């Protein structure tokens, strides 16, 4: 068994997965850079999105938000409304997760889920309402929670 930074024991497979994720993070960073230089904006955005997902899987929500915001910028620049909605949702979810440690993050989560609701298709609007309901419930605002659920 190995020990991580918090003194928790990790199995060898957990350690391998973290090393593998770290390598993939570097690969996606390099891919985003290469795509940006080549003018392949859609692929650049996908690399940022994939990097955000990897950070989410590692529980590094602040870093994931940084990558999702880069993805959002690219989506706006190329007019990818579906990607923009996805980015708003991902950012909102991460702020919601960070709100469990710092309730001030719930305000950011509400902002991004509201933006998601504004640009999303019908299924996305439904998801945004569900997420807003969850946030308002966690904040103790049951009236707004019931409106969105």
Regions found by a protein language model. Name each.
Residues 31, 48, 67, 71, ...:
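Aromatic/pi-system hotspot detector in well-structured domains
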Residues 1-43:
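Flexible inter-repeat linkers and adjacent short helices
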Residues 32-36, 55, 75, 113-116, ...:
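Eukaryotic all-alpha helical interaction scaffolds
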Residues 7-17, 43-57, 82-97, 124-138:
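Conserved alpha-helical positions within TPR/SEL1-like repeat arrays
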């Amino acid at each position: 068994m190995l020990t991580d930074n918090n003194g928790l024991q990790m199995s060898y497979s957990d350690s391998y997965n973290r090393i593998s994720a770290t390598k993939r993070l570097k690969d996606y960073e390099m891919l985003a850079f290469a795509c940006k230089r080549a003018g392949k904006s859609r692929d650049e955005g996908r690399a940022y999105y994939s990097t955000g997902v990897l950070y989410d899987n590692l529980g590094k929500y602040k870093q994931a938000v940084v990558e999702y915001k880069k993805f959002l910028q690219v989506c706006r620049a190329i007019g990818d409304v579906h990607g923009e909605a996805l980015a708003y949702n991902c950012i909102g979810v991460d702020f919601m997760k960070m709100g469990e440690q710092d309730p001030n993050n719930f305000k950011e989560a509400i902002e991004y889920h509201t933006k998601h609701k504004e640009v999303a298709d019908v299924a996305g609007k439904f998801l945004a309402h569900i997420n807003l309901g969850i946030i308002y419930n966690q904040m103790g605002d049951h009236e707004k929670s019931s409106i969105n659920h």
